[in-house]
Each structure stands twice: as C-alpha cells, then as structure tokens.
C-alpha cells in the first residue's frame, strides 16, 4: 500500500545552502520531518547548481514522517536579473529602466525554464519571459 501524504511544503531555498534556520527549520519541524536529513539531501542534489541561487522545492511529507522532494528551476526574475547584471528590478518599470537583456538571453532562460513552465513551445515561453523582463523594468533588445 502506498504511503499516505500528510502535507506538501513549498519553499525557496538557496542552492547548496539549506540549513535548519528559518525558513527551512520551522516549515519542516511543524511536519515532524528530520530537518538535517532534508538539508543534507537538498545540498547534495543542488551542489552542481551555482551556490546561493534560490531554488523552489516542493517537499512531500508522508504520515510516517518520511519525505520526498522535487526541485524546480530558479525563478525567471532571478535568472533575468543575473543576465542583465542588476541587483533588483525597477520600482517604476514603465518609467525607470534598470537594465537590458537580449532576445538570445531570454530564449536561453526560456529553454532553462522549459521543464517547469507550461507553454506550447519555446517561443511562447520566451514571450512570457519577455513580459516578466518588461514588468521588472528591463529592456528586451534584438
């Protein structure tokens, strides 16, 4: 018989830097999960990814307090900021432009995000990423 799912916990944790401090500790502690076991497994799985990049993770907690987790690709906004070389997006994206990204960079980000995004094809996903870039105050160039 399959294990009974107790809860799903969604977090964003920096790649290779999971530790028992908030937000990881309290979120998993409430479910009775072995926090250090999760931290070691997560850090091992994300050691090939650039350290410090926020990685969304969905942790499935079972009734016997065991768990499994699925890592996703970093948020599009984080990848866009990295590509444009800016620290944060614009507070007034329609007035103040903070950086530039090329269509090639946008397409590359769309290909990276393809596993997690719903879209007909890479072009549709690239248009979605362009919209995110514009809403952050980034200019998309050809």
From Swiss-Prot:
GO molecular function: large ribosomal subunit rRNA binding; structural constituent of ribosome
GO CC annotations on file: cytosolic large ribosomal subunit
Quaternary structure and partners: Part of the ribosomal stalk of the 50S ribosomal subunit. Interacts with L10 and the large rRNA to form the base of the stalk. L10 forms an elongated spine to which L12 dimers bind in a sequential fashion forming a multimeric L10(L12)X complex.
Spans through the membrane: none
Keywords linked to the UniProt accession: Methylation, Ribonucleoprotein, Ribosomal protein, RNA-binding, rRNA-binding
Stored SMART domains: RL11 (SM00649)
NCBIfam families recorded: L11_bact
Family: Belongs to the universal ribosomal protein uL11 family.
Entry comment on modification after translation: One or more lysine residues are methylated.
SUPFAM superfamilies from the UniProt entry: Ribosomal L11/L12e N-terminal domain, Ribosomal protein L11, C-terminal domain
Pfam family, one: Ribosomal_L11
Record function comment: Forms part of the ribosomal stalk which helps the ribosome interact with GTP-bound translation factors.
Lineage, uppermost ranks: Bacteria, Pseudomonadati, Pseudomonadota, Gammaproteobacteria, Enterobacterales
Record-level GO BP terms: translation
InterPro entries (UniProt xref): Ribosomal_uL11, Ribosomal_uL11_bac-typ, Ribosomal_uL11_C, Ribosomal_uL11_C_sf, Ribosomal_uL11_CS, Ribosomal_uL11_N, Ribosomal_uL11_N_sf
Domain of life: Bacteria
Protein name: Large ribosomal subunit protein uL11
